[in-house]
Amino acid sequence: PGQSLNLQDNGIKVIVGQRQESKTWDKAIADGWEPGVSLFPIEEALEKASIICYLLSDAAQIQLWPTVKKHLTPGKMLYFSHGFGIAYSEKTGIIPPADVDVALVAPKGSGTSLRRLFLEGKGLNSSFAIHQDATGKAKDRIVSLGIGVGSGYLFETTFIKEVTSDLTGERGTLMGAIQGL
């Protein structure tokens, strides 16, 4: 919830979509999101949103894609924090329509760290990338979102470079591949 809470604290109107009767729905309520006001079932949130922050695991993004895709109307933005679904679209099937912006902000740390640093008045470095600029405003939109979520510094990349960097860091460092070599 770090990104959504930081955006809200920065004055952005945020709505959250979760599966009802789930732990994530209950957690959203515990985090202060109000059912029917700022918390909605996924499809209702998708319908209402102008920017869809697709912050699910890679596997969950693939599974939910048919539902998300039907709500991507012209001018909306599809926002990611990891580039896998787009970078490997031939495998994932995640191919957005041409009339929406597609971009990412990838904080270089967990949502918990992002939130903690935000509350301390600090920021977490993030990369940003634009896959598709249908509106001519994708860069302005994504940089604004990057600042809003609590990025201390933003550097431009591509979706494929973000995936390569992320997987190298996760697999090579956090999961011990370097130590195993």
Label for each model-derived stretch:
Residues 168-178:
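A short glycine-threonine-serine/GTX helix/turn-capping micro-motif
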Residues 19-20, 33-87, 95-110:
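Rossmann-like NAD(P)-binding element
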Residues 25-26, 62-66, 140:
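Alpha-helical elements of the RecA-like P-loop NTPase motor core of helicases
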Residues 11, 60, 68, 72, ...:
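Structural signal for hydrophobic packing residues in well-ordered secondary-structure cores
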Residues 8-33:
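NAD(P)-binding Rossmann-fold cofactor-contacting core
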Residues 2-7:
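Glycine-rich adenosine-cofactor-binding loop
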Residues 80-169:
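Rossmann-fold dinucleotide-binding core
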